[in-house]
Amino acid sequence: MLYFESLKDKFALNEKQLNKFVFYYEFLKQENQKMNLTSIISLSDVCYKHFYDSLILKEIFNFNTVTNLCDVDSGAGFPSFPLKILFPHLKIVIIESSLKKINFLKQLSSHLELDNICFFHQRVEQYDIAKNGSYDCVVARALARLELILKWCVPLVKKKGYFIAMKGKNFQQELEASKKIIKQIRVKLVSAKTLELPMQLGTRTNLLFQNE
């Protein structure tokens, strides 16, 4: 329980939230034996590379100021499911191209008693254009090059809403390559926060953009 206790201390989780993360890990480990959901499956790696990595977004953005969140290509639920556990008021929309991962997340949401989560089985570039401008905040984690995810994701964001791109340590190169699209779609980089995961498990940079 050491890794879970460190999450509890870092993010001020209550016992109910902590128990949800414990179940999340056990269910992920169980279902991953049946289908390939993630290559990251050890307890320490899941706690820090998945849970911690998702929850740390609260340091770059105040999720209490928004009501809905769109997670693009969520995979096994990161970062939206950890954020939903921490911020239960959020209405979550997940766009995911893998049907098996959607089915996993539907089961998980039922087990964790997480409500107000909608799932769309499709690629983000094929997502219903009528829903453009629908979301207070959109987030994408390890989806594609920054210039591509800006092109795909920012149109989903409301005017004056926010987009969070979760990137690695080489974000500066991607940011430089994205100057043209940033100007074209009229989005502003508000903040860039680089952090080291615990136990030297990697470097992350979270980029916060505002749709102008």
Curated annotation (Swiss-Prot):
> Any idea which UniProt keywords this protein has?
Cytoplasm, Methyltransferase, rRNA processing, S-adenosyl-L-methionine, Transferase
Annotated compartments: Cytoplasm
> Where, by residue number, does S-adenosyl-L-methionine bind?
78, 96-98, 124-125, 141
Q: What is its main location?
A: cytoplasm
Q: Which InterPro entries match?
A: rRNA_ssu_MeTfrase_G, SAM-dependent_MTases_sf
Fetch the Pfam families from UniProt: GidB (PF02527)
| Superkingdom of source | Bacteria
As recorded in UniProt, its EC number(s) are: 2.1.1.-
What's a Gene Ontology MF term here?
A: rRNA (guanine-N7-)-methyltransferase activity
Does this entry carry the keyword Phosphoprotein? no
**Single GO cellular component annotation?**
cytosol
Q: Which family does it belong to?
A: Belongs to the methyltransferase superfamily. RNA methyltransferase RsmG family.
Function, as annotated, reads: Specifically methylates the N7 position of a guanine in 16S rRNA.
- This protein is called Ribosomal RNA small subunit methyltransferase G
**What organism, scientifically named, is this protein from?**
Onion yellows phytoplasma (strain OY-M)
